[in-house]
């Protein structure tokens, strides 16, 4: 399993780190119609998805066919989506990277009015020899609700010492 490499800190497996980092960088730079081929960055049984859902269960797309279909849907529903302020963080495992970024673009999700979304994201990438085995995406679900025109509930935080 790629996640089980023994760690020698950040100075081990340098070529593997470089190769995996290049894949993560390419994923985060992929825009427009190029997203229709983004599934090619994954292993044949790789998966990607959102870990912020109303069910509490991740929404996962596994395998090239499902990831390709997701790419088509994303291109239709978020036609000009771009990641920016991208910061990639290596870990002591050369096959695992974290990314912090902002995302923005038009929303054209069926069943909701056209809108615009800006949100902050955390991405986890697990890789095997330059191919993504798992990509997990985390974001602020309240910003997603706002972008879709869904009323956001007010959370009472009485007594919390926030400024």
From Swiss-Prot:
Function (record text): Involved in the biosynthesis of the antibiotic, phenazine, a nitrogen-containing heterocyclic molecule having important roles in virulence, competition and biological control.
N-terminal signal peptide: none
Keyword field: Antibiotic biosynthesis, Virulence
Listed name of the protein: Phenazine biosynthesis protein PhzA
BP GO annotations: antibiotic biosynthetic process
Coiled-coil annotated residue ranges, if any: none
Gene that encodes the chain: phzA
Family: Belongs to the PhzA/PhzB family.
Domain of life: Bacteria
Family annotation (InterPro entries): NTF2-like_dom_sf, PhzA_PhzB
Ranges that cross the membrane: none
């Amino acid at each position: 399993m790629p996640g089980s490499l023994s760690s020698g800190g950040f100075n081990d497996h340098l070529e593997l780190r470089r190769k995996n980092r290049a894949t993560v960088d390419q994923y985060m730079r992929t825009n427009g119609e190029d997203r229709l081929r983004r599934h090619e960055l994954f292993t044949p049984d790789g998966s990607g998805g959102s870990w912020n859902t109303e069910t509490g269960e991740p929404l996962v797309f596994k395998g090239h066919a499902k990831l390709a279909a997701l790419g088509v849907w994303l291109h239709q529903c978020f036609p000009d989506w771009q990641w920016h302020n991208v910061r990639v963080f290596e870990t002591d495992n050369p096959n695992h990277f974290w990314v912090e970024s902002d995302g923005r673009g038009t929303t054209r999700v069926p069943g909701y009015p056209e809108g615009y979304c800006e949100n902050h994201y955390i991405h986890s990438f697990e890789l095997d020899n330059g191919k993504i085995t798992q990509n997990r995406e985390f974001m602020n679900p309240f910003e997603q609700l706002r972008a879709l025109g869904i009323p956001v509930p007010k959370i009472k935080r009485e007594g919390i010492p926030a400024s």
